[in-house]
């Protein structure tokens, strides 16, 4: 059985993703020209977007990675508690930080993470997300760079998973409810 069989509908195609990443890369390159840009990928979900975005950014930049969780295992609901599993390797002092996220959902994780990063004395901290789900927002946080707004559906692909599956789909799709309500 193919992973595609578990998808109810494709929300964002591979072609749409490629075009949007190129557009975001061009905007970020222009906005951060002459600055000391650090792209901070929030793993695991943003790894695919990060790999594509960093190649679309045409100015020098550093990259770093964090593993942060407010979900557990196959849970589909945030716990509201943010746990740093892997912290940054580099120093953010005096740098312009752009958090690279797969999806901005409730905003709880980022609303706690942004102030933590600001304590590292960067010049700025902004957010870039490929997907935004504003209908589920619980925290007062908005992306500075946004790819696509998506409805309140369980989405997978392009780095997003359910129980560590579907990350490698080249598109963003809605998972059939029977898959995650078993």
Where does each model-flagged region fall?
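PRPP-associated nucleotide enzymes
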Residues: 1-182
